[in-house]
Amino acid sequence: MNADMKWLDNPEVFRVNQLEAHSDHTYYESYEALEKKENALIQSLNGQWEFVFSKNVKSRPENFYEEDFDAKNFDKIMVPGHIELAGYDKIRYINTMYPWEGKEYRRGAYSMESTGDGAGMFSEAEYNPVGSYIKRFDLDPELCSKRVRICFEGVEEAMYLWLNGQFVGYAEDSFTPSEFDLTPFIREKGNVLAVQVHKMSTAAFLEDQDFFRFFGIFRNVTLRAVPEIHLEDVWFRPELYKDNASGKLSVNLKVSAPENRKINARFVLKDQEGSVVLEKSAALQEKNGIYTEEIQTDDAQVKAWDNHHPYLYHVYVELTDESGNLSEVVPYDIGFRRIDVIDKVIHLNGKRLVLTGVNRHEWSPKTGRCISMNEMKSDIECILRNNINAVRTCHYPDQIPWYYMCDAAGIYMMAENNLESHGTFQKLGAIEPSCNVPGSIPQWKEAVVDRARSNFETFKNHTAILFWSLGNESYAGDDIEAMNTYYKEKQDGRLIHYESSFYNRAYEDTISDVESRMYAKPYEIEEYLDHDPKKPYLLCEFMHDMGNSMGGLGTYMHLIDKYDMYHGGFIWDFIDQALYVKDEVTGKEVLRYGGDFDDRPSDYEFSGDGIVFANRVEKPAMQEVRYYYGLYR
């Protein structure tokens, strides 16, 4: 198969040769390696790459992926990172509009009769920047003679991949991992990896979030060697009984190995003191080299997980061959908690759930959405310090470590899909969905369901996730209903959230387990709850903290005492989106916001809505948050 630039125009092509999404577990070949946290099966490709920027597809270096290509005119660029922050293209901040508005007329493929299939919309555009990357590497010794895969944890927005002159695959969805099998093409030494990243494709219509519009390889890139017997996917399903003191655990395993092998799996659940709570073994059933099993445990005494007591158990899954030799061990931390809706009121472990939440973009004033572990840890500390008990991953999946941090800290999560098509149904504030995507357009359905699948499969084992969110501000139609159906069929006990069905009540019974609003006034909340409400109510966004804001928080919080079906909400938002630049006059480092980069169209200082500044200094409004949230956390 050869790479085809026309895929950029086609909403039905969003992954080519990608491996299936799977759980985000790590794996080791021995307990010794696990205890030392030294994983010789992983090789990072982060660091300096060769790079060239092109204005559009036709001016890109077409044959740059060939092994004998002369890249002497290429620059150097650091991965991970945004191409714009390396000095290429233009820095742009936009809220609802698409970056081409006022410059080019574009409507999503098949969204209007006049649009047709959108052929050439992005592949032949005069402006659609391309970043061509080359990484040369030798395999670490421990990866040799094994199956080798590559994982890109985040690439905006569409990417083509080659290794040693051979086409490997294509991916969209900027914020979930894209993984490919390199085994047929890789060698021990002298590998040439080539990645071509396109700023816009049909995925641009689905990624119209309120943020700076960057592109490039902005999250980690790793090679992963796969043992002969390998746990491809694991789904831990802890069940907490109504006494909040006992429960059981189901474990679904999917293992790859050569055919006709006798493979055994054993899992052990230990408490924080190291005592064994549950233990069970099973022989795996094989079909075409894939071995599966569902293991059910007996009942056991367990401790419940919640925001005040985020108790996690340590699980270890061992895979052994027919001789009893250990092939792989997988660690994971899980908690026991129970979500119920009783008389239209959400309960966690039998108690009414109150959300003192915040929406959180991933942001660094120096590196944009390419944030560090220290910045994530700082955010966790700030959240706990100020009585915030929940985060919404607006409006895309976050880096994988963030979910583990929230599990450990007891921070409730609304895990949102990478979806916002705001600009296709809202024009300068007016609701006008004539060209909405995905809507009910068949050609867009699989792309958005795939985003739901990637979100679920990657993060399904995280105790902190109480809600799956279908996306943000994308109107409502059959395609989003299909996403809702996908999550429902998983029956994982979590609730499904979506706000924009408010604009299309034809779907209110088939999309979302909650009535969700953004920026509803207090009297509007009361009006809904006073008139035979159908669902529990929450605010996915409220208290827009732009400028000197947050003064009305108490009015909203007092409604929690008045209405059991009102569950609080998520402040917009956690952190200002602003970038450090050197001031032209003083030479000092200052923060600049949307519109400060001569970016048009722009929504200007609308990028500054946080309860902390971009440098993570708390704003004066935080004292309101800390006080009122402290009354209900």
Regions inferred by a protein language model and the residue ranges of each:
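Short glycine/proline/serine/threonine-rich loop/turn segments at secondary-structure transition edges
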Residues: L143-K146, I186-G190, D299-L312
